[in-house]
Amino acid sequence: MGKVIGIDLGTTNSCVAVMEGDKVKIIENAEGTRTTPSIVAYKDDEILVGQSAKRQAVTNPNNTLFAIKRLIGRRFDDKVVQKDIGMVPYKIAKADNGDAWVEINGKKLAPPQVSAEILKKMKKTAEDYLGEAVTEAVVTVPAYFNDSQRQATKDAGKIAGLDVKRIINEPTAAALAYGMDKKQGDSTVAVYDLGGGTFDVSIIEIADVDGEQQFEVLATNGDTFLGGEDFDSALIDFLVAEFKKDQDVNLKGDSLAMQRLKEAAEKAKIELSSAQSTEVNLPYITADSSGPKHLVVTISRSKLESLTEELVQRTMGPCKMALEDAGIKIGDIDDVILVGGQTRMPLVQQKVQEFFGQEPRKDVNPDEAVAAGAAIQGAVLSGEKTDVLLLDVTPLTLGIETMGGILTPIIEKNTMIPTKKSQVFSTAEDNQPAVSIQVYQGERKIANQNKQLGRFDLTDIPPAPRGLPQIEVSFDINADGIMNISATDKGTGKAQSIQIKADSGLSDEEVEQMIRDAEANAAEDEKFANLAQVRNEADGRIHAVQKALKDAADKVSDDEKSSVETAISELEAAAKEDDHDDIKAKLEALDNAFLPVSQKIYADAGAGSEGMDPNQFQQGADNAGENNQADDDVVDAEFTEVEDDKK
């Protein structure tokens, strides 16, 4: 087995890590940063991921997808999805199966398909660092993700060309990273994870058992639609209201203005973690008949805190519930670990300290701990690390609908996984020939108030009075938290089983088609990269030859100059088209036309009359071209100019 990488697939940012010996390496991406924005943009025929996608978001808001994780595994009619529709500039559409998808240029895309683009970027980042192909990964999800969301995350990995060996919960992964430096002794930790789109809290017991570190999750709780994006939205709403009050113009309908506001709000929020006040200054945010309008608003830290205090307070309920479910008191917590970028906000740290009665630890990197923990689990699965045992739990109660529409639990929340549990049921009517098993996940007593994961039928039950047939329903949850469910008629031995896939979710055929599409895109991406490289080569060659012609003007005949200039013109024309081979041919033609000139230059310089390799003239230019390929900041200079314009 090769390296199993760890990926934190975040709402706002993603991160990839690998275990090297007894240390975790957080891998820098091509731009040189350790985290990558979880943003995917569709521009012409190109798919941009990460920083390059983020840079062009202002000029391409409708086709730039961010916070896609909040839609993964969700139904279009979910209240939280309907709320999101009014908050994002891109279009959220209803798929044929009722799922929440997105629509780009008239084409519907599933959230796992979009997330796969981010995972591909993480995969490529790891491959570039390791110098070998990577096919296996541990991917993290919010602890409070339900079965549909976990399955959708695995689908995203599959589309990206990854075998997801394990799905683990983000707080658990962070505890693994924290425990790496804690070599001995037992402790109970609370992991408070407030990320870009989700909130989780887990109570985890770390024990030293015969030289092996055992991480046992006692309880977990959270909110899968509460995170930094909501803090941004609160600030954006305030800025929109201030502008409306000042200029009598509503910016809500202007997607370009809203995208600029989003960037400015995120920046202001971050600045206010260290500064007492900051200014949001957006010139030319819009215009009307009276001329251009500018948005200039000064925001204090106290104002931001008043706008978001309710959001921070919402995290306290799950903390209290997690402690109750774990059966421990606040005083039993030895350490509090903060995970997720939003925990850098002073108000969040203050409220957490007040709740737990102790200052949270500052020695765990909130942006990288989750990926580090995933890499540790990857090393455990590959056999590279043998002194760690992870015991996780299922976050939500699992059960089936019984008479009266009641949810009858089969597996209670916070049950350790993997696990298998069974319960015997019977028929509700005389001579009932079949039973329908409807599976739900959640904490409500009324079945249909919970998340329906799926349904299946057990048929051909022999005629019998009600209550007589014995039907055993078994739930089997694997280490990823994904279920297989079976129902068996104990009288006949007839059984029916399924791996739960909700009425929503991607079919196997859809996943396979998306894999094929991704492979086709990979071929297109390579073609695009090769074309960009040969264009860079052409540009560098033209520049070098023109400089040489100018420097040696007195040594070159008119015919030679004309021949070279014709070759340059033909190469410039070819470089504007998309024919890689034609550009190569025109490059060779320029080299041949320039050869007599290079021979004269060398002969005159006393270097002999063999002529020089024209490539030498633009070696530096070629090297610069190669650097451009590895650096999105240079490739996408046009985006940087747009950014400068709006400052």
UniProtKB/Swiss-Prot annotation:
InterPro entries: ATPase_NBD, Chaperone_DnaK, Heat_shock_70_CS, HSP70_C_sf, HSP70_peptide-bd_sf, Hsp_70_fam. Transmembrane segments: none annotated. The modification Phosphothreonine is found at T198. GO terms for molecular function: ATP binding; ATP-dependent protein folding chaperone; unfolded protein binding. Residues 605-647 are annotated as: Disordered. Residues 629-647 have a biased composition (Acidic residues). Keywords: ATP-binding, Chaperone, Nucleotide-binding, Phosphoprotein, Stress response. Acts as a chaperone. This is Chaperone protein DnaK. The lineage of its organism: Bacteria, Pseudomonadati, Pseudomonadota, Gammaproteobacteria, Moraxellales.
